[in-house]
Amino acid sequence: IIANYGAGFNNIDVTYASKRGIWVTNTPNVLHETTADLTWAMILGTARRIVSADRYVREGKFQGWGAKLFLGGDIHEKTLGIIGLGEIGRSVAKRAIGFNMRTLYHQRNRLPKEGEQELNIEYVTFEKILRESDFLTLHVPLTEATEYLIGNDEIALMKKTAYLIHTARGKVIDDYALVAALKEGRLAGAALDVYENEPEITEGMSELT
């Protein structure tokens, strides 16, 4: 038996395991609150430039207060876009209520009106969620439909002031397109928990601050 620690199992060749008579199990519905917390840590950290500011101080560069030094961006009353409203996406949406955000979501199947009202969320098209989100967070599984869901064309639709948050599966984003967009100032920032070709970090990613 291969008992996978987590809900996803795309790291296992299930077809081959089945041929060899090996059972494959996963552990769904145990980490969605934890991952939602991580998502919000990444939203806050990226918007407020916490990691960059911490590195700046530790490197001995801090020379005193500056009005625009690591100014960052606000979260309160901004627009949050959630792509994929499974258990993690819903938990992320619940936390957005405390920031009085306008929360948009997109997935294949729309929730009943009661579910949308409970989470204070609005269903929109894929194009609209790209265009209107100040913070776009991804919570989809890796499938043929979601592989490279976000690439050059999708980033081109996003605001230059937008932040992209990624805690799903690496190949949902074209990392090279993301690196180029960040270097060229076509996005305000990004926070990634996963990479396209793990364990390798995409070329150019570590140079970004």
Regions found by a protein language model. Give the residues of each.
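Short glycine-rich, flexible loops that bind phosphorylated cofactors or substrates
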Residues: 10-11, 143-145, 172-173, 199
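Phosphate/diphosphate ligand-binding glycine-rich loop within oxidoreductases
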Residues: 1-58, 72, 164
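Rossmann-like dinucleotide/phosphate-binding beta-alpha-beta segment
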Residues: 65-160
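Short glycine-/small-residue-rich Rossmann-like dinucleotide-binding loops
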Residues: 7, 134, 140-142, 168-169, ...
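Rossmann-like dinucleotide-binding domain for NAD(H)/NADP(H)
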Residues: 24-25, 161-209
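Rossmann-fold NAD(P) dinucleotide-binding segment
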Residues: 1, 13-16, 145-164, 175-176
